[in-house]
């Protein structure tokens, strides 16, 4: 495995660990064992098709095009998670997809569902 492939694999494992820190059972996809083409870099993340990139040269539109193409079969939201050396991890997605997520958040929190699920009534 070349250094750049190792760096990419390390970053994918790192991002999966970040998701696990938030309670998701994220794992790195093993793309060289038959999961190619439409496979995300990470699996078991609800709603998102994640492409992970740890590169110094940013080609964000190319990366997003890859995520959009590869997510078509699953219907998940194409998302690019990226960083460069000595910088924080960032996430990008299409604006319409962001607004769908934000609207879902807004609807769920307006009734307090995110923090406190509604109690069942005895009536």
Task: Put a short name on every predicted segment.
Residues 1-123:
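Catalytic phosphate/metal-binding cores of nucleic-acid and nucleotide-processing enzymes, i.e., regions
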């Amino acid at each position: 495995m070349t250094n750049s492939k190792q760096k990419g694999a390390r970053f994918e494992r790192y991002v999966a660990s970040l998701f696990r820190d938030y309670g998701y059972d994220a794992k790195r996809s093993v793309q060289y064992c038959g999961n190619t083409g439409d496979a995300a870099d990470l699996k078991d993340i609800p709603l998102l098709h994640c492409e992970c990139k740890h590169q110094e040269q940013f080609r964000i539109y190319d990366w997003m095009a890859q995520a959009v193409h590869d997510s078509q079969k699953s219907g998940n939201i194409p998302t690019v998670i990226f960083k460069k050396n000595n910088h924080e991890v960032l996430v990008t997605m299409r604006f319409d997809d962001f607004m769908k997520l934000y609207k879902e958040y807004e609807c769920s929190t307006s009734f307090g569902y995110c923090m406190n699920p509604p109690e069942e009534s005895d009536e």
